[in-house]
Structures are given as structure tokens and as C-alpha cells.
Amino acid sequence: MGVPGVFNVYNALAAISAVSFFDIPDQAIIDGLRVAHVKGRVEPVKVPGNYSLLIDYAHNALSMENVLTTLRRYRPHRLITLFGAGGNRPKVRRYEMGETSGKLSDLSVITEDNSRFEDVMDIIEDIKTGLHKTDGKYVVVPNRKEAIRYCMLNAEDGDIIVLAGKGHEDYQEIKGVKYHMDERELIADIIKEEHLAD
């Protein structure tokens, strides 16, 4: 399989079970698994430099733990996790995400993620409550694009940077309005703005 993680093995096994009822040749299944990928699930984004940048939909503590535990097995120089938490959702999720990232990441970059009708800084304070249960290092960069820029400009050789929470989503929801925002486009913009491809 072209995607890492035990959770993806389970997904692949479920898919194999489902297609086994349709007389699909084994080789076709094998070939399909080799090229299978899901947008926003441990999705690599090509960047200049000797670090890896991944987009993942991990938007709760369990999914974040699965992704970060899997990526730890690759022994990165540093594992950097950028994430926020959705507004108008249970606060306990924020505490749990902060604690999970604090335990498993070398650096947490806390930012916005669909604040909805809540103040972004209130959400960030809740995330910090969870982080403070750990010895994890963190920085706060409330604007998501600027948080991504921070990660890219401070990346070191061998780092793995995970942009968690948005995944396949191409919007940011603020005060009841969904604004277009695709992390892939933000990354491309940052590469141009910072002349990183030169």
C-alpha cells in the first residue's frame, strides 16, 4: 500500500472484503492498493527542502494519535503538528487534542480551524490547557496560512510536518460563512511568496 498506518491496513482489508463479492481479479486488487490514496489522509505535498509536509484530516484526539504514532515510526528529526479545533464543539475535544499533540509531537503549532461562532483565541486557550498537561513545546500562530508559513520557514532537514484537521476540506468556517481555503493552495502561495522554489 502507498499509505502508512495500521488504520489504513484496516481500511484496505475492509475494501478487499467488499470487492471480493464482485469477481475482481486478485492482481487488480493488488494494483489498486499500490496506487490508492485518499485526499486529505496522510497526503504528501511536494515542497522544496529536505522535509516532508503532510495534510491529514485528523480532527480529534484519536485520529491525531493514530497519525502521529504512525509517523513517529519513521523516526523524523522532528515531528511538527499544526492544528486547531472546531468551534461550537465540545471543549473536551480541544483539551484532548492539545494533550495528544503535546505528548507525541516535538512541536505543536496551534492555529485556527473552523472557529464557527467562537473566538479563535478562546479555542486556542482550551487547546493550551491540554498541552500544559505535557512537557510539549508549542507556538501559537492564529492565522492558518501564517502558521503554515511558520512551519515551512522553520523546517529542518528530516522533519515531518503534519497539517492536521482540514484534510479534504477546502474552506474555513468563520461566523457562519464558509470562506474558500485549500491548504494545498496556501502552500503553493507560500512557496511563491517566499521564493522557496528558487
Predicted regions and their residues:
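A short glycine-threonine-serine/GTX helix/turn-capping micro-motif
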Residues: 1-6
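ATP-dependent carboxylate-amine ligase
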Residues: 14-40, 44-198
